[in-house]
Curated annotation (Swiss-Prot):
PROSITE patterns, A to Z: MPN
InterPro entries named in the record: eIF3f, EIF3F/CSN6-like_C, JAMM/MPN+_dom, MPN
GO MF term (any one): translation initiation factor activity
Name of the featured protein: Eukaryotic translation initiation factor 3 subunit F-1
Domain MPN stretches: 8-138
Annotated source species: Drosophila melanogaster (Fruit fly)
Gene Ontology, cellular component aspect: eukaryotic 43S preinitiation complex; eukaryotic 48S preinitiation complex; eukaryotic translation initiation factor 3 complex; eukaryotic translation initiation factor 3 complex, eIF3m
Oligomer status and interactors: Component of the eukaryotic translation initiation factor 3 (eIF-3) complex. The eIF-3 complex interacts with pix.
GO annotation, biological process: antibacterial innate immune response; defense response to Gram-negative bacterium; formation of cytoplasmic translation initiation complex; positive regulation of Notch signaling pathway; positive regulation of peptidoglycan recognition protein signaling pathway; translational initiation
Localization in the cell: Cytoplasm
Protein role: Component of the eukaryotic translation initiation factor 3 (eIF-3) complex, which is involved in protein synthesis of a specialized repertoire of mRNAs and, together with other initiation factors, stimulates binding of mRNA and methionyl-tRNAi to the 40S ribosome. The eIF-3 complex specifically targets and initiates translation of a subset of mRNAs involved in cell proliferation.
Keywords: Cytoplasm, Initiation factor, Protein biosynthesis
Gene3D superfamilies: Cytidine Deaminase, domain 2
Similarity-based family: Belongs to the eIF-3 subunit F family.
Length: 280
């Protein structure tokens, strides 16, 4: 498959690691680079992990600690053997003169390595994210070169990552003086209440869109219509009594689990106090 047909999907943990490496950089370092880890399947490069590679850039050369990169990759393989080298990343909003030299090294580590740039300077008020592949250029018998060509890049996440991001959003906009050091997980019933409220708001948004389309206030979108049709077909067919019975049964099970967990928590706390109780 041609490198131009690749699509890059980046997980949030990768961006967090890039920002953390940029914040911990040496005082004389203008940018940070590192290795991208993940997998490639059917033209999709999924980047799930990364690590920083110490380096120094001079006017005419680049010095990188390649032995450190190999050791970090070997350690990561022991933890997750499914992740392999898929490319490299760098902070900044564009490709520099040294990028082709660094890319040559990663071209020996994997086929069609991707280059990911993360704009940690937040130009335009947002963190720019771009992905490139290197295309060889030249004529037969003449000089050859390479050109970094942009390819599609998008953010994706697993369900646990999405849940973690929602917890992080609870502290966004809170001043550092009042920001809590920890965010405890919500109780199960509170999660159900929050999810129900969000579901209700989404349903209201869908109903408003449908009403506007019927009233010719909004131009209909065929893609949205197909998604709504798939959503309707995904709803299980059951009567109101069946749904109420199923919902009540699930609530009873949830309350039973909460009660048992609280009893276990109380028993552990009591056992801890009895263990450290001074004996006469």
């Amino acid at each position: 498959m041609s490198a131009l047909n690749l699509t890059v999907r980046v997980h949030p943990v990768v961006l967090f690691q890039v920002v953390d490496a940029f914040e911990r950089r040496n005082a004389d370092s203008h940018r940070v680079i590192g290795t991208l880890l993940g997998s490639v399947d059917k033209g999709v490069v999924e980047v799930t992990n990364c690590f920083c590679v110490p380096h120094k850039e001079h006017d005419d050369q680049v010095e990188a600690e390649l032995s450190y990169a190999l050791d970090m990759y070997d350690l990561n393989r022991k933890v997750n053997s499914n992740e392999s080298v898929v490319g490299w990343w760098a902070t900044g909003n564009d490709v520099t003169n040294h990028s082709s030299v660094i890319h040559e090294y990663y071209a020996r580590e994997c086929n069609n390595p991707v280059h990911l740039t993360v704009d940690t300077s937040l130009q335009g008020g947002r963190m720019g994210l771009r992905a490139y592949v290197c295309i060889q250029l030249g004529v037969p018998g003449g000089k050859s070169g390479c050109m970094f060509t942009p390819i599609p890049v998008e953010l994706t996440s697993y369900e646990p990552e999405t849940f973690g991001l929602k917890l992080l959003q609870k502290t966004v906009g809170v001043s550092p003086a009042h920001r809590p050091k920890t965010v405890p997980p919500m109780l199960d019933l509170a999660q159900i209440s929050e999810a129900s409220t969000k579901l209700q708001s989404l349903l209201d948004l869908i109903l408003k869109y449908v009403d506007d389309v019927i009233a010719h206030k909004v131009t209909p979108d065929n893609a949205v219509g197909r998604q709504l049709l798939d959503l309707i077909h995904s709803v299980p067919h059951m009567t109101h009594e069946q749904f109420t019975q199923m919902f009540n049964a699930n609530v009873r099970n949830l309350l039973l689990v909460i009660t048992l967990s609280q009893l276990i928590k109380t028993q552990l706390q009591l056992n801890e106090k009895l263990t450290f109780l001074p004996t006469a």
